[in-house]
Amino acid sequence: MPQTIEHLPNGLTLRQDDRFFKLGQDSVLLSAFARPRRNARVLDLGCGTGALALLIYRPDLQITGLEIQEGALDLFRQSIADNGVKMTALQGDLRRIRALLPHGSMDYVICNPPYFDRGAGKSAASPEKQTARQDASCTVEDVTVAASFVLHTGGKAAFVFRPERLWTLLEALSRVRLVPKRLRFVHQNTLAPPSAVLAECRKGGSAEGLIVEPPLLVQSEEYSRIYEK
């Protein structure tokens, strides 16, 4: 399968091919929204070809990407080597997270989870893309359970999701003690409904203190800065 190389806003490169979803807006915006502390242990759940892990890269972070599809993980490993950065590419099913990573071993989780229920939404062009786009291999609940398991109390997780399924995400988060602390909606313009929502949660603690940040508008100066950083 022919590969392409994407140049990321932070100067790193990403290997891709047509079997898997290529770099999109969601991963770029989530990487700008997420705020792992210095020297944090970070897990990218369902990392695919590693776009989000590479976008969020800082030399002080200890980043692990977990992915079920070996082909996608191979591309991630190649990108790690291309960039000369230190990351861990881990093959495994997040539904079996207890056999893969220790409980409470992460400070921060990032994830672009499945958008649609199985059988809903547009059909993907390949089985690999179908797995990534829909709840075919795991559900949103599987994702939140895995995130909560690896986070220590006080650890945080950041997600990007479809606004029309926000309640599904919030319900799943509440079942595993992940409390939303920051929300930000992405709009194509000032008159359009949101096309994506960014959410940061904290494991444990009070449900008070949710911050809804100002909308992020596509084609705004801030949006351009995110892509040009």
Task: Please place each PLM-identified region on the residue numbering.
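SAM-dependent Rossmann-like transferase core, predominantly class I methyltransferases
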Residues: 3-41, 47-57, 211-212
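General small-molecule cofactor/ligand-binding pocket signal
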Residues: 15, 64, 88-90, 181-184
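Conserved Class I SAM-dependent methyltransferase catalytic core
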Residues: 19, 137-194
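Mobile active-site "lid"/loop adjacent to the S-adenosyl-L-methionine
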Residues: 113-142
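Conserved SAM/SAH cofactor-binding pocket of Class I
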Residues: 32-122, 145
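SAM/dcSAM-binding transferase cores
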Residues: 191-229
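Glycine-rich, phosphate-binding/catalytic loops in enzymes
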Residues: 31, 125-128, 175-176
